[in-house]
Amino acid sequence: VAAWGLPPAARASYQLLAPTDSTDGWIRLVDFDNAGEQAPMRPGARAWDSGCYFSLMVRVKDIGAVYTDAIELGWWTETPIAPLQFGESDLRIVIFKGPDGLQVQSYERLSPPLPEAVGSFERMTRPFNVMQMVADHGTAYRFFTDVLGFASYYTGPPVTAPSPVLSPIGIPTPLTTEVGYQAGIVYPTPGEYGRLEMIQVHGLRGEDYRERCRAPHLGILAVRFPAPDIDAIEARLRDRQLPLERFTEVAWPGGEWVDLLQTRSPDGGILQFFKIRE
């Protein structure tokens, strides 16, 4: 709790959601108590509002059935299920909107088949990506690649549709021919999981919520990565005089102790790097 900058009287409980056969892509649902005002990080936010984290991203099978079940559970969606062609991938996408500002972006790839590295799954994978909506694509992309040393999976220019089309991120259909979105995808280690995506919407000006990305506010609070060399990350941040916090011997679930380094992306998203102490 102290690492979140909360008062001494604050308390927190959590539930950890994770497939039994994985060591990454876990989701921790945290409930803060006696921690001060709780308000949405991205109140009523749309894709053209920047700051904090926009959505978790999962792969699914039979997205129509998942959609039906999610609605019955009380979730809602940004749009109907939307088609998207990303390179060779023929995708169907929908963003589910749940309680406390949580958004889960679901992908079904119709073709080509998913890579074997995705692994087998019955209906839904663990999260493979976390999306940020950013004020400036170049600034965010360089932070992850040049400062943190992440590898690039994809980056490209703004994309607009040749004719009006249903947008998975909710850009109004009549504007999709003139309002573009610019994406970048990075990862600390190349693979099918552990990715971070940043999108800048060009042509629609929204709110900037970066100052609201903090506990105990509601939404996606932070993304954590294991890091074998926290000192190297700290040195990169200090060289550029960027904010950071370092915590040693933090109690971890399971009785372990970790060293923890915390920083923020240019759009306020909290990033934590941890190393389990031997």
Please provide the spans of the model-predicted regions.
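N-terminal juxtadomain amphipathic helix
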Residues: 1-10
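Vicinal oxygen chelate
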Residues: 10, 15-16, 24-30, 55-123, ...
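Conserved donor-binding loop and adjoining core beta-sheet/short helix segment
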Residues: 31-36
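Glycan-recognition patch characteristic of GH18 chitinases/ENGases
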Residues: 45-46
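Eukaryotic phosphotyrosine signaling hubs
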Residues: 53-55, 128, 220-221
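Amphipathic alpha-helical segments
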Residues: 72, 136-152, 239
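Acidic, glycine-rich loop-and-strand cores that form catalytic or ligand-binding grooves
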Residues: 150, 183-192
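Low-complexity, glycine/alanine/valine/leucine- and proline-rich hydrophobic stretches
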Residues: 202-203, 214-225
